[in-house]
Amino acid sequence: MSAPTICPVCPHHCRLAPGETGICQARTNRKGYIVPSGYGVLASMALDPIEKKPLARFMPGSNILSIGFYGCNMRCPFCQNYTISQRAPKQNARRVSPREVLADAAEFKRTRGNIGVAYTYNEPLTNYEYVRDTAHLIHEAGMVNVLVTNG
């Protein structure tokens, strides 16, 4: 059996044997590489007021497309999103590509005044590859990216 691989994504530095998943439920050791457990598996997607992020002074009165993933590297007893943040991605769940998020964001921009995408509801950086890929497309389309993070 291979030696455990240390996950570099958060301060927990989980030591994962092949096939094991970290405390966040979002990172897995596959053949010695730490990879996302569910790239593109969204737990939630909704158009929210920017103030809900909570950003009271950043483009007040605007809407933003909020997306969230499964898993989180913290165990906050007061978490309002506990049901999604403390679960592993559903293996049979539909995957949403970054281009599909861009299409939804652009449609909401046209019809509802959307300003971009907020990565929220859990710790988005446990899925940093998806955030990176999506944020690049959103930025190129002239919209904003907002990270609601615990770090």
Describe these PLM feature segments:
Residues 5-27, 70-82:
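Local cysteine-cluster metal-coordination motifs and their immediate loop/turn environment
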Residues 29-151:
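Conserved Radical SAM active-site core
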